[in-house]
Every structure is written in C-alpha cells, then in structure tokens.
Curated annotation (Swiss-Prot):
Cited SUPFAM superfamilies: Metalloproteases ('zincins'), catalytic domain
Lineage: Eukaryota, Metazoa, Chordata, Craniata, Vertebrata
Region of interest (Juxtamembrane stalk), ranges: 1215-1256
PROSITE patterns attached to this UniProt entry: PEPTIDASE_M2 (PS52011), ZINC_PROTEASE (PS00142)
Catalytic activity entry: Release of a C-terminal dipeptide, oligopeptide-|-Xaa-Yaa, when Xaa is not Pro, and Yaa is neither Asp nor Glu. Thus, conversion of angiotensin I to angiotensin II, with increase in vasoconstrictor activity, but no action on angiotensin II; angiotensin I + H2O = L-histidyl-L-leucine + angiotensin II; bradykinin + H2O = L-Phe-L-Arg + bradykinin(1-7); substance P + H2O = substance P(1-9) + L-Leu-L-Met-NH2
Assembly behavior: Monomer and homodimer; homodimerizes following binding to an inhibitor. Interacts with calmodulin (CALM1, CALM2 or CALM3); interaction takes place in the cytoplasmic region and regulates phosphorylation and proteolytic cleavage.
UniProt organism field: Bos taurus (Bovine)
Pfam families documented for this protein: Peptidase_M2 (PF01401)
Gene coding for it: ACE
Family named by the database record: Belongs to the peptidase M2 family.
The protein's name in its UniProt record: Angiotensin-converting enzyme
Binding site for chloride 1: 231, 529
C-alpha cells in the first residue's frame, strides 16, 4: 500500500547499535521571516493568521519533504542527519505557529462561523511531536530515522554464506510471490521478521512513550485517539466493527477455499483443514494479499490466464511505460496529466548504482503546487501495474487540491486518499480493459471466466480486509497501554489468528517483534485508512460506473474514457479535507455512511460459488483448532535452496522424459550392436554412449536434486523425481566413471568370449558346448573337468577386476546417499525390512527344498556310488546338470520318480516336427495374444537375434530382452536351441517384452517392473501354463494332456528341479554380494565365503579343493555383469502367487499345477492392468491388482508343490533319509578325480595336468608329496566349509531393473 505525502518505505538489514549512530543533529533556528506575527484574537484575525501560515508552511514543508526524499532515495548517515535537522525545523515551525494559534484563538475558535477556517485552526493548533522539549524532540526524530533505516536496510542472508543477501524488494518479495517451496518460503519469512523486527522493538517502545506524551498535550488520550480523530466520528470504532462483521462471511468462505487448495499442495503435515493457515504460504510477506497464489487456487485453470504479467514482459513494457499507461487512464477521464517535475524527479525503478533506498511505493507532495513525485521500485508485473495506478491516484489527488490551504491538502479522510487509485485499478484489472490496452487477446464473458476473475480480485481485496482492520487494532492497544511491551508479539499474533485465521510458521516469542516487520509500523503510517479505503473504493466504483452509464454486473465495469465519471471524481478530489468527509461522500455516492453493500454486490457471484464449493467439500468455516501450529520441516534450513514448486517439477520431468528417450535409445542401440557383435569398434562406441548416458544422468539427476519433493501432493511426480535423483554410477567423477565402465566391459567381455581348451586344441564355449556337456554327461571326470576349467578360465580372470569394481560401486552408492552398493540395490524394493522378509520366505520354502535335496542326493548316490556321494553330506556341485547347480532339470532322467511313466519332455516332438527358434517365439507370441495381450510388433521380428549367429561373430549369448525406448522397438537376444527348456525361456523373455509394451506410454522413469522381481515373474507365469501337459497337448507337443498320479508326480518333480532347486541359489548370490559390498567379506575370503553360503543354503560343495586364488562367483554371468540377483528369488515366489490368482480369474478348477490360463481374457486383463503400472506405483499396488492382497507369500508355491512334497516326505521316510547335510565338511573322494580328461591324452594327478607316462613314474617318486598334498587339501577343505554367521544388515535403497534375465539351460 502506498503512503501519501512523503511517507517512508522498505528494504532490509540489522541496524547498527545506537551507540554507533551519529551524534544528535545540530540545533538550528527557524528563519525569523517564518515566525508568526501578531494577529487579532478574533475570526477576522484568524483568517489573516491562516493566510500567513499557508505561505510560510509551504516553504517549511518543501524543505522537510525534500530532505526526506533525499534520505529515502539514498540512505546515508549524512542524509539521515539532514533529514533530522529538517524535521527539527519543521517541528519548531509547528510549535511556533501552533502555540500562537492556541494563545490567540483557543478561547474563541470553536465559535467561528467559517467551517473551513475552523478546520484550518484545528489543524494548526495540533502540535504533536512539537509539544516535546528539544531533547525529546531530537530523540523522537532520531527514533523515526533509525526505525526507517533498520527496516529499509535489513537483509536476509543465505545460510552459512555472506552472499547473496536478499533485500525485501525485490528479492524477498519475489520469493514470497513465486516460490512454492515450503522451506524457502519459511526461511525468507523467518529471516525477514527476525532481521527487521527484532532490533526495532526497543526503539518502538521509546517511540510509543514519546508520541503519547506529545499528543496528550494536544488533548488526546494517546496517539491512537489522535489518529482516530481524523475520521470525525464518535462511533468510528463501532462502525468499523459493524463493517467487518458484514464482510467476515465472505472472508471465511475465501479462507476455507484457499486452505483446501493449499492442503492439496502441501498436505496434512503443513495444512490443518480446521486450523489457521501458516502465514508464509499466501504469496505475500504479511499474508495481506493472496493474488500471488492465484495459480494454486484458480477455479477453472483451462480458462484464459488473467495475470497478464507474461504478456507485459513479452511486449517489452518497462516501468516508465506502466506509469504512462496509468497517466493515460486519468487523462481519459478528463483529469490532469502528470506535470514535468513528476517525470523528471520521480524514482520509478530501484537504482542500479548501489544506493540503499526505501523501496516501499509512496507518493509525495512537495507543497509548492508543482512538484509531485512517486518513489517505487517498480517491477513489470500486473500486480505492480495496479500499484502504479494506486500511487498515481495519490498524485492526482495532490494535483486536484493543490489550491486548497496547506492544512486542507489531505484526503477527506485518510481512506479517501488510499481509495482513489484503487478505484481506477478496479477498471484497469477488468478483462475488457486489459483487452483495450493490448494485454489480453480476447474477452471471454462466461460464468467460469467471471468466477476466475472475481476470485483473483477477492485474493487481493477480500483477503486484505482482516489485515487492514487488525494492524491499527494492535497499535491502538499499544498506544493505550492495553498491550504492554511484554505482550507486543503475543497480542499481534492473537489478532492475526483471530481475524485472519493465520499462524506463525515457526515459534515466536517476546524476543520477536513481528509487527515491526511491516513497513507502516516502524514508519508510523496509520493503517486503518486501508480498511476504510477498501470499503470506500467500491462505493466510489459503483457511483462512477453509474455516471459512466455502465450496464451489467459491477465487476465488469470499466470507466475508462468516461469524462462524466471523471467530472464526478474531480469534484471529490478538489475538496481535499476542506469539508467533512461525510458530506463529500454524500455528494459522490448519495450516502454519508461507509457501506459494505457495493463491495458485497461486486463479489456476489464468487461469494455464491465459494459457498457452494465449501459445502460440497464439507469445509469448516473458520479455524476451531486455532492453537494448531505446523511442524518444522526436516533438516531446516539446509534445504531452503531446493525447489518445491510442482509446476516447475512437471516441466523438468517432461524435458527429462523427452531427452531420455533419445539418449537411452542411442545407448540401447550401441549396447545391442556390441552384444551381437563383440568387437573393438563396437566396444568403443558402447563406451561413448555409456559416457553420454552417464552425462545425461548426471545432468538431470543433479537438476532433480534441486527439488524438494517432501511435500509434493502429486505422488507420481514425487516418485519420478526421487528416482531421477539417484545418479547411480554416474555420480562418480568422470575419470572413475570411465574406469568403472571399462571394468564392467572388460569383465563381461572376459565372460562372453571365454572358451576352455583340451590339450589337443579342441576348445569349448559356454554356449552351447559346456552347457550341453554339463546337461547331458554323466561322466564324473568329464563334468569335473568342465566345471573346473570354466572357473579357472573365467573366475580367475575376473578376480583382478573385482575389488576395484566393488570399491567404485560402493563409492557411487554413497554419493547417492546409500550406505554401500548392496544398500543401493535393495532400495528398489521399497521395503525397510527386505532381508528379514526374504529370510522368512526362504524358511517357509526350506522344507520343500530339503526333501528335494535328500531325494536327489539318494538318486545320485545310486548312479555315482558312495565314493562321491555322501547321504549325509553336501552334493558335489558339478553333478546337478548345470554349471552352477542352480537348476537340476537336466538330471531328471536320473531322478524321475516313475521312469516308466510317459515322458513329458516335448523336446523330441519339437525336433520331429521341425520346430525352429522362430517357431518357438511365434508360439510364445500366440500364447500372449490368446490372453488379449499385445502381439509382438514388426520391429521385434525384424531385429531380434533369436539364434546364435553362424557368421563367426562373437556374441553375448545370455538371453535378454531389450527395450529401445521409442515405444515400438523391442527385441530379444537369445542363442536359442530347439528344446522344451528354451521354449520356456522364450516365454520368459517375451514376458519382458510384453511388460515393455504395456508400460511404453509411461514416462521413461517408470518403464520398468513394479520391482525387479516382477519383470522376471511375468514370463515365468505364462511358462507355468506352457509347461503343463494340458498345454503341450494343445500345441501338439504331447499326445495326451491328461495323466495319472505317476505322471503328475513326474511333472511336479521336473518343475521342482527347475523351481525349487533354484530357490537357495537365487537367495544366496546377493547374500554374498551384499556382504562383499558392506565389507564383511573381503578379497582375502571371497571364495571361502562364497562356498560357505552355497553349503549353508544349497547343500552343495566343490568337487575339487578351492583356494583364495580361485574366484568361483565370477564364473556366474551376473557377477561380472553386475546384475542384481535376488530379483530371481522374488520372482520365483511371486510367479506362483500370480499363477494362483490368474487361474482363479480363468475359472480353473482342480490342482494348481494343472492350470493352463491359455486363451483366458480375464486372466490377461489382470496381468495387463498390473503391467501398465510399470514402476509408477509401489509394487504392493501391482500385487494387489493381480492377487487382491499386497504381500509376498510362499503359500501359493507350497500349494502348487503340495502333492510332490507329500510324495517326497513319504519316499524319504521310506529310505530313512537325513534331511540336510549334517556331515557338512565332507568332500568327494579325490582318488576318483585321477584319470584321463576326455580327448586330451593327459591325466590329472593330484591336481597336476600330466602326460600318462609322467603320472606313472611320478606316482612312486611323489608318493610322499601326494600324501602330504592330500592332508593339506583336507585341511583347507575343513576351513573352506566352516559355516560363518553374519549379521543381517537392514535394507535401505537399491538399483533399477536391468534387462538381463536369468537363463536356465537344458
């Protein structure tokens, strides 16, 4: 609010102590020519006295105002001193003339017949501060100067920094207006109230005492009584209360509506729907005007934006142009243009030369009838355009009444002066007028647009009413003594809560002086004038609109260019304060009372709308929980520079998503090219794209970290940004990132291109050679050679890289806020007790595994004999049909419960029928589409690698599904063999593709599984149906789909060899890695701890002695490829939960293991709905969509295998099997390891690879060494298999899904 005539303004900084202030000003004497003469003590003499006073007062007031202007536009000690000197001279003048008026006319002046003279003498005889003696007068002036300086130079500095420090205008004002960050707003609010308010309190106490002392000598009870006297009404305070009660319902409805909108943004933590609103959230430092949060509360956001700030900026408006536009409005009414002095001398922008100035907008009358100025740090905004009209309204008033006696150059009452500019602003802000001046393209006169406009006006006008009312309620209490200094702040907040329904956002006490943080308090500008003006301006507006011939709703009136309205306004302005304001008001509006009815009429449409909205929402009007206060934000104030504006966040994620699709697509293409053609060139390109991806991640992740999402009400936005904030490996410094990427590439390359060779030069690759050997051979020595050779070649080669990989993984994790790499990986599950819950699931499944283990061990004992199989010990790891003993389905022929029953392996039929890898994937596609799911797109068939190339290329054979992030390109890379096992794998991989396609329209951030296990489970769910004899019969791979009990047990055994056998391995791999990451497993015991866990959970042991020179974990793809593994454990549990739920949806009746959901659209819909969520919601929501509940459970898996478990328990009982491996330190007879390796012509003699002749001679020569070696081996084995107990660490955070998937080979 602008002050009239020479009022001071704002800025910010803690003041100097009074002891450091300059000495009191030099005592100056009033020019004798300005002293009053002698006049007759009658009415005629009073007329001469008034004329003489007028000419002298103009000179003194000009000098005083000029000194104040010089100070307020350049705050220096020298200018402060000159201002105080001018104030003393002005007070000396007032004392001389005021005392003369009292001496001459006090006995007679109230009987004067000239009412104008009566008003002049009454004004002159009021001395105010001039009543004080010189010493007190000097102190009074010094207090005013210092209070103004403290307020105007106060600054708020950024935490722990000396710069930048914020001034009130423009920095803090802009923050309060535009920021939506709860913590930044809080810091700005608290900082300003502390910086400006606290140092003012002792000065204000002293000012109050001196001011009261001065006005009591004029016959007033206190300063407040003097201020109220300007309104010439004995019932003034009662009239104000009556007006406020009339207007309060409108305010309460606005308050409730805005509180609800803020609740949507800030949530329950910071907004209580039955309590007051925290004062810093309303777009203004004092919560007096709320239009800056219009974007948060706009009723109909799709309608044209009525805040034309952006248009003003686009059109190049500047401060001068804004004032020219305002001037043109006045002149269009036939009123006066601004004089040359106005344009030459005004300060319309904040100076850029470093001067401290009082930025608070104010209009100045220099009392020489030609010099009128405005001081405003104007910003190009719509709000400031209204302020420009407001301030120019003051100047127009000065121009119109400049011919009046100097004592009457005031508004009819102070509210009149404040109302004039605002009356014009009511027209300026209408859409019709904004269109006329080129700031709005079109005017939309529909109900929704009207409600938008009126709500915007209500945020300015109605929101202000209680504040406009309470400020002087508080000051009148201070002046009267009802509010002593010990209760300054308490009473201030009592009134603000009582009338405004706001509360301080931080704890306040009597060390604070929050009233002093409002310009008008330290600058001693009475405030009730603004409340009065907000009522008057609508009375004026209604009268002027009528004069202008306006037809229609009052809020649509624009008096622009109406000279009739201008003439009526001119008559009011020219009267100044020469007549009672009631008379002037009656001439203007036809009534001599303040009346709220025009205001209520103006806002009637939005009042009705607010009432309806609040009733619909069940809003509580008022704040019954008035004592509620918001909690302090976590880690305040460290995070104040973070952005919490959801609109800004939305723009960020939109840009991130657009760019990510490009970057991720390029990376996927480079990765594909390398994986399908391992070459130096492709390696280099992949490294380049890897670095590009890292740079992208760093750029946007760093940007994302500038957002504080704590109070985001949009959960999706919050989730997205939190995910982007995790930079993963890209958090590493550039050199270390390059090193890390090279390590990963080197490790994966070692794994992918490795081959093992016989002495005769025959070399075997993992795919398909070693895999087939492990699957089909039953020769103990051949299997041992393949098992050991692979680990010698791959594991030992990877070991040198691994410690550095661990170090950099941990460093990246810690840079992202995690404890270590394992903590980071676990975070993807969003489960605070992930490890404990996984352990619980494992324990639930362990009985099934132990019975399967005992049964298989008995079968292997029958085949290999007691020398290498101990019925109470672990199973040698190379005998289970798989390089890692993770899936045992390849030894089904050795363990089949009923070998004479019909076989259910469709491999033979597939080969006979001429199936190809392409046919296998077409069949998988058919399964998905039969459920109503999406078919594979053309790009899939054109670009996938479904077979191992025959052109000599080195490829990564490990099956994987690929999303190229363009919404149409999805591929599978698989070295497919024609067998039933790979048919199942084809469905698994296509499950990933189906997932990709279902969530392809989500933001890139959410294009992954609900948790990593979900992605793995989807394809396997379908495989559970595909594997059933019923389904194999449907697709003509089995002659019959129905079997008896024996066939059922055989089928379940085959499934258990794949599913149950895998459970402990999938559980332990990351148990080992998590311990490596947390440091409890070090390089010195990598291998020992690996085998300790494999023994503990799987009950397997190495077939040969292992040492710390070996690195057997590295022989498993996911270790060098850095792919988290516990996802597979999770997927194996939840796939059975999904299967059970989908079978129920499909209407299946009977045992769960016989269910085939093929062609069930109902099951497909459940699956599709869950997949469409991607990662957009926590995984329990996706689980609930499919299963109806939100927890992982082993119950469905146990139900599926219940018939087999019953059979196993009976069978194991019949043979007296020991469950578990009590003789855990047993190892297979090493003598069985001697003998020829297949095709090599060489033998292994006590671990040495020798020619046969060398071995025979060496048997005798090295007998003693052999015995010693055997003893040493047994000792080492004892140490290897000692079971260690490690404390489980609590999970926290983790990585995102990688496209590599588990492949179980046949």
């Amino acid at each position: 609010m602008g002050a009239a005539s020479g009022r001071r303004s704002p800025p910010l900084l803690l003041p100097l102590l009074l002891l450091l202030l300059p000495p009191p000003p030099v005592i100056l004497e009033l020019d004798p020519a300005l002293q009053p003469g002698n006049f007759p003590a009658d009415e005629a003499g009073a007329q001469i006295f008034a004329a003489s006073f007028n000419s002298s007062a103009e000179q003194v007031l000009f000098q005083s105002t000029a000194a104040s202007w010089a100070h307020d536009t350049n705050i220096t000690e020298e200018n402060a001193r000159l201002q105080e000197e001018a104030a003393l001279l002005s007070q000396e003048f007032s004392e001389a003339w005021g005392q003369k008026a009292k001496d001459l006319f006090d006995p007679v002046w109230q009987n004067f017949t000239d009412p104008t003279l009566l008003r002049i003498i009454g004004a002159v005889r009021t001395l105010g501060p001039a009543n004080l003696d010189l010493e007190k007068r000097q102190k009074y002036n010094s207090l005013l100067s210092n209070m103004s300086r403290i307020y105007s130079t106060a600054k708020v500095c950024f935490p722990n920094k000396t710069a930048p420090c914020w001034s009130l205008d423009p920095e803090l004002t802009n923050i309060l207006a535009s920021s939506r960050s709860y913590t930044l707003l809080l810091y700005a609010w608290e900082g300003w109230h502390n910086a400006a308010g606290i140092p003012l309190k002792p000065l204000y106490q002293d000012f109050t005492a001196l001011s009261n002392e001065a006005y009591k000598q004029d016959g007033f009870s206190d300063t407040g009584a003097y201020w109220r006297s300007w309104y010439d009404s004995p019932t003034f305070t009662e009239d104000l209360e009556r007006l406020y009660q009339q207007l309060e319902p409108l305010y309460l409805n606005l308050h409730a509506y805005v509180r609800r909108a803020l609740h949507r943004r800030y949530g329950d933590r910071y907004i209580n729907l039955r309590g007051p609103i925290p004062a810093h959230l309303l777009g203004n430092m004092w919560a007096q005007s709320w239009e800056n949060i219009y974007d948060t509360v706009v009723p109909f956001p799709d309608k044209p934006n009525l805040d034309v700030t952006d248009v003003m900026v686009q059109k190049g408006w500047n401060a001068t142009h804004m004032f020219r536009v305002a001037e043109e409005f006045f002149t269009s009414l036939g009123l006066l243009p601004m004089p040359p002095e106005f344009w030459a001398e005004s300060m319309l922008e904040k100076p850029s030369d470093g001067r401290e100035v009082v930025c608070h907008a104010s209009a100045w009358d220099f009392y020489n009838r030609k010099d009128f100025r405005i001081k405003q740090c104007t910003r190009v905004t719509m709000d400031q355009l209204s302020t420009v009209h407001h301030e120019m309204g003051h100047v127009q008033y000065y121009l119109q009444y400049k011919g009046q006696h100097v004592s009457l150059r005031r508004g009819a009452n102070p509210g009149f002066h404040e109302a004039i500019g605002d009356v014009l602003a009511l027209s300026v802000s209408t859409p019709a007028h904004l269109h006329k001046i080129g700031l709005l393209d079109q005017v939309t006169n529909d109900t929704e647009s009207d409600i938008n406009y009126l709500l915007k006006m209500a945020l300015e006008k109605i929101a202000f009413l209680p504040f406009g009312y309470l400020v002087d309620q508080w000051r009148w209490g201070v002046f009267s003594g009802r509010t002593p200094p010990s209760r300054y702040n308490y009473d201030w907040w009592y009134l603000r809560t009582k009338y405004q329904g706001i509360c301080p956002p931080v704890v306040r006490n009597e060390t604070h002086f929050d009233a002093g943080a409002k310009f008008h308090v330290p600058n001693v500008t009475p405030y009730i004038r603004y409340f009065v003006s907000f009522v008057l301006q609508f009375q004026f507006h209604e009268a002027l609109c009528k004069e202008a011939g306006h037809q229609g709703p009052l809020h649509q009136c624009d008096i622009y260019q109406s000279t009739q309205a201008g003439a009526k306004l001119r008559a009011l302005l020219q009267a100044g304060s020469s007549r009672p304001w009631q008379e002037v008001l009656k001439d203007m509006v036809g009534s001599d009372n303040l009346d709220a009815r025009p205001l209520l009429s103006y806002f009637q449409p939005v009042t009705q709308w607010l009432e309806e909205q609040n009733q619909q929402n069940g809003e509580v009007l008022g704040w019954p929980e008035y004592q509620w206060r918001p909690p302090m934000p976590d880690n305040y104030p460290e995070g104040i520079d973070l952005v919490s504006d959801e609109d800004e966040a939305r723009k960020f994620v939109e840009e991130y998503d657009r760019r990510s699709q490009v970057v991720w697509n390029e990376y996927a293409e480079a990765n594909w090219n390398y994986s399908t053609d391992i070459s130096t060139d492709n390696s280099k390109l992949l490294m380049e794209k890897n670095l590009q991806m890292a740079n992208h991640t760093v750029k946007y992740g760093t940007w994302a970290r500038k957002f504080d999402v704590t109070n985001f009400q949009n959960a999706t936005m919050k989730r997205m940004i939190k995910k982007i904030q995790d930079l993963e490996r890209a958090a590493l410094p550039t050199k270390e990132l390059e090193e890390y990427n090279q390590i990963l590439l080197d490790m994966e390359t070692v794994y992918s291109v490795a081959s093992v060779c016989h002495e005769n030069g025959t070399c075997l690759r993992l795919e398909p050679d070693l895999t087939n050997l492990m699957a089909t051979s039953r020769n103990y020595q051949d299997l041992a050679w393949a098992w050991k050779s692979w680990r010698d070649k791959v594991g030992r080669s990877i070991l040198p890289y691994f410690p550095k990989y661990v170090e950099l993984t941990n460093k990246a994790a810690r840079l992202n806020g995690y404890q270590d790499g394992g903590d980071s990986w676990r975070s993807m599950y969003e489960m605070p007790f992930l490890e404990e819950e996984l352990e619980q699931l494992f324990q639930e499944l362990q009985p099934l595994y132990l019975n399967l283990h005992a049964y298989v061990r008995r079968a292997l004992h029958r085949h290999y004999g007691p020398d290498v199989i101990n019925l109470e010990g672990p199973i040698p790891a190379h005998l289970l049909g798989n390089m890692w003993a993770q899936s045992w389905s390849n030894i089904y022929d050795l363990v089949a419960p009923f070998p004479s029953a019909p076989k259910m392996d469709a491999t033979e039929a597939m080969i006979k029928q001429g199936w190809t890898p392409l046919r296998m994937f077409k069949e998988a596609d058919n399964f998905f589409t039969s459920l109503g799911l999406l078919p594979m797109p053309p790009e899939f068939w054109n670009k996938s690698m479904l077979e191992k190339p025959t052109d000599g290329r080195e490829v990564v054979c490990h099956a994987s599904a690929w999303d190229f992030f363009n919404g149409k390109d999805f591929r599978i890379k698989q070295c497919t063999s024609v067998n039933m096992e790979d048919l199942v794998v084809a469905h698994h991989e296509m499950g990933h593709i189906q997932y990709f396609m279902q969530y392809k329209d989500l933001p890139v951030t959410f294009r992954e599984g609900a948790n990593p296990g979900f992605h793995e489970a989807i394809g396997d769910v379908l495989a559970l149906s595909v594997s059933t004899p019923t389904h194999l019969h449907k697709i003509n791979l089995l002659s019959s789909g129905d079997g008896g009990y024996e066939e059922d047990i055989n089928f379940l055994m085959k499934m258990a060899l794949e599913k149950i056998a895998f459970i402990p391995f999938s559980f332990l791999v990351d148990q080992w890695r998590w311990r490596v990451f947390d440091g409890s497993v070090t390089r010195e015991n990598y291998n020992q701890e690996w085998w300790s866990l494999r023994l503990k959970y799987q009950g397997v042991c190495p077939p040969l002695a292992r040492s710390q020179d070996d690195f057997d974990p590295g022989a498993k793809f996911h270790i060098p490829a850095s792919v988290p593994y516990v996802r597979y454990f999770v997927s194996f549990v939840i796939q059975f939960q999904f299967h059970q739920a989908l079978c129920q949806a499909a209407g299946h009746q009977g045992p769960l293991h016989k269910c085939d959901i093929y062609q069930s659209k109902e099951a497909g819909k459940l699956l599709a709905d869950a997949m469409k969520l991607g990662f957009s919601q926590p995984w329990p929501e996706a689980m609930r969509l499919i299963t109806g509940q939100s927890n992982m459970s082993a119950a469905a898996m146990m139900t599926y295998f219940k018939p087999l478990l019953d059979w196993l328990v009976t069978e194991n009982g019949r043979h007296g099997e020991k469950l578990g491996w009590p003789q855990y330190n047993w190892t297979p007879n090493s003598a069985r390891l001697e003998g020829p390796f297949v095709g090599s012509g060489r033998v292994n003699f006590l671990g040495l690879n020798l020619e046969e002749q060398q071995a025979r001679v060496g048997q005798w020569v090295l007998l003693f060494l052999g015995v010693a070696l055997l003893v040493a081996t047994l000792g080492l084995t004892q140490r290897l298999f000692s079971i260690r107990h490690h404390s489980l660490r609590r999970p926290h955070r983790g990585p995102q899904f990688g496209s590599e998937v588990e492949l179980r080979h046949s």
